[in-house]
Amino acid sequence: MRTKKQNFFLFLKIFAAIMVLILGGLYYFRDALLQQVIAKAETKFQTDYNCHFSVKKANFNGLSEVELHNILLVPQNADTLLAVQNIKTSYSFLELLTGDLQLNNLEMNNGFIQLVKNKNGRNFDAFLKRDNQEKSAEKRNYAKLAYRILSKVLNLVPSEMQLKNLALRTDDMGRKVVFQLNNLQLEDKKLQSDIIVKTAALTQNWKISGFADPRDKKADLKFSSNDTTKIQVPYIDERFGLKSSFDNIQVKLDKLEMESGELHIDGFTSIQNFTLNHPKVARKDVVIENARFNYRFLLGSDFISVDSTSSAQLNHIKVKPFAEYNTEEDTIYKLKVALPKMKAQDFITSLPKGLFTNFEGMEAEGTFDYQLDFEYNKNKPNKLVFDSKLNKENLRILKYGAANLAKLNGEFTYRAIENGVEQRPILVGAANPNFTPLDQISPFLEKAVLTNEDPSFFHHRGFINEAFKQSIVKNIRTKKFARGASTISMQLVKNVFLTREKTLSRKLEEILLVYILENNRIASKSRMLEVYFNVIEWGPNVYGIGEASQFYFQKSPSELSLSECLYLASIVPKPKKFMWQFDGEGNQKSYAVKNQKYIKNLMLRRALITDLDTIGQSVPIYISGKARSFLKLNTVVDSTVTDSISFDPDEFDF
């Protein structure tokens, strides 16, 4: 009778014999098995993607090296998607036995991938279709899913690689770009490549070099030009009119690991001398000399986040960001930004050139820090959190740039800009007979305009957090910038110091200039409002209340009635379209009357006016000045004509 030890060794012998038979069978039938795999792939491409896939010749060299010749992938009635003359690769047999395909070596020569979009469609559409299979009711685990995908991708990146004469060709309705990879070599964890990029307008020589270890999941790669020129990003200039270039980009991956059920991805990326040009961004080139992002991405079972230990740097400006998408209970978006204490002058000199032209040459002293806290619950949008806080210490402007905010306190010349063209000069000062001091303007006008435009003007510091919150909620709901949150301070800065161009640059400058104006007490609130009333547009080529009161009513600003002030306040958002408020008889249409009544009722509720002030105000306003010539009046009154314009409550957003 055999002992347990003898039985164990017998089992090992039998197991070894079976493994030898299996390996021998695999070795003997390896080419036949390879043909079956290729045939299965051909069938899948045909049935699932309506594509013809073929390999002219395929064979094994030994047990773990495969060689393929003349590989083609051609969608039906479309341009060839892929063609490669020769592929030779080896894989880890032991890893394959565990269910993971891990490539050790890869050689690929003479081929291309081609992405085409033309009037007949796209040659890659079949690969973008959605999977119609029912989704599992099981909650998705972001960490496990991401780690599984990234691990499989990195396993398919060989530890040794040589690619020669390969190309990526793109053709988007005639906009063609060719990325020609003459040679890419990965050996002893060192990557070196040369790429020629061709478009209709230019030819560039790029290179990628550095350290790459797909098995240890680490890399440190630098992307730059082979000569002294900057890399120009192709395609997007032709497609979107966005011109961009840079000296080099560096990407480093230090860590990609699962720890306690969370996926950690650590590293950094940086860019040097990044230049951007687009008419929606700024009038001139925007230049970022140095930018760096030290990242730590964390993925858990129900969240994806940029960890608070991450940091971003723009020249001398350092930021500590935190962002999170969380689905544990509700769908919640979080964003926190902390700008540690820094010198004000370092902040000014670090701003991207071309994006803040009015700040160029500005000098300041003192320090400040900043915190932003934002949280949005998709299921509870009205509970949005938006908290912005800036702390300053001995902050003082020593010298202004192009925008001299101090000029608000004295006499100056204002020129409105229409379609990029300066309009006639308006002198803001006593030498202008139309200039009207604040105490000589009807108090009804001040109260009506503030009620309609900025009720808390005398109390805020340029911005209204609650208005921003409402604006954000509405923009998210409508998925577009449907609502703004502009204060009188912002309107004043925009009118006096900036152009009317709708660019990112102009909006960012507006925000910063308003903050400086309001928080450094450069001009009093009363003076700001006085300038505002004397420069804003109140009709076609009508600027300031002095001109407006004569243009509409042939009165001085102090003589305006409550009804006339309500009318003037109501047309501030769209002054050039005032004539559409009136019918053919010169009377205000019902929607305009309703809007002005709404403003009046708000003023009553806020005790800005009394019931006595409204006595006699039911009489319709009469346009008696030059504005009457702009009205579409009937020469013969037709009593059958009805008002075709109905009240649109969304036309006036309070």
How should each PLM-predicted stretch be described?
Residues D171-K189:
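Short, solvent-exposed loop/hinge segments that bridge or flank secondary-structure elements
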Residues L128-A143, N404-A430:
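Charged, glycine/proline-rich intrinsically disordered loops and linkers
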Residues K57-R169, K189, D194-K222, D237, ...:
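Flexible beta-edge/linker motif
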Residues S151, N155-L156, E418-L608:
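Peptidoglycan glycan-strand catalytic modules in the bacterial/periplasmic cell-wall system
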